[in-house]
Amino acid sequence: MSRVDFDQYAGHYEAIIAAQTNFFDGDSSYFARYKIELAHQLVGPVESVLDFGCGIGRSMPHLREIFPKADIVGCDPSADSLAIAREQNPTCRFVSMEELGADSRFDLVIASCVFHHIPPQDRQMAIRYCYSRLKECGHFIIFEHNPVNPVTRHLVKNCPFDADAVLLSMSETIERMRDAHLKIDKSSYCLFFPQQLAALRPFENYLRWLPMGGQYFVCASSRKRDAVRAA
């Protein structure tokens, strides 16, 4: 399977995302904001954040709003995506993985729907890389598509830049993070209710055990920390 070249999609990535997610919420930024708000619930305020696989920087406005004092850095292999991200988010820094200094460490590393693009044989190396970027007591949160959800599978199958996607289950993600010596703090399913059922969204916390959310998250830390908050 050939790898997707995200430089080819950078200029119209936003339009593709909007078309793909319109059925769930007319505001295509809903997903990005949802995840950053959830990250804040999980770990509280932080001084530094790395968005691993940041793409065109769709999470950056929400990271800047919710973590206003943090040093926020995005990294991505797509140079064209980084160029767009820099233009649209002047208060954040954007670098390639090669440009990220060897000593750079962060309180929080987020990877949002990144790992299904990474070949399975390379995933452990990518998780270890993210682990190596954590400060002591830092947190690493992976958000991923839920392969158990049939709607999610349909969307991935029909998304042009998911042509190389190999979905990974929550159990695989947890196992890989544990193998990298991360402590699992919390794992749950999320994104259950579309905009038409927005009145039910406050009840998602009671359904996080149910493997029918559109996505899931796993929050882990670089060592035991009792201060992780329930979300």
Region locations from a protein language model:
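Conserved class I S-adenosyl-L-methionine
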Residues: 1-43
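A conserved beta-strand element that flanks and buttresses the S-adenosyl-L-methionine
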Residues: 110
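A short glycine-rich, Lys/Arg-flanked "PGG" loop and its adjoining helix->strand segment in the class I
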Residues: 124-136
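Short alpha-helix
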Residues: 166-181, 187
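Short, glycine-/aromatic-enriched active-site segment of Class I SAM-dependent methyltransferases
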Residues: 146-163
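Conserved beta-strand signature within the Rossmann-like core of class I S-adenosyl-L-methionine
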Residues: 137-144
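A C-terminal cap/extension of S-adenosyl-L-methionine-dependent methyltransferases
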Residues: 185-231
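Class I SAM-dependent methyltransferase SAM/SAH-binding core
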Residues: 58-99
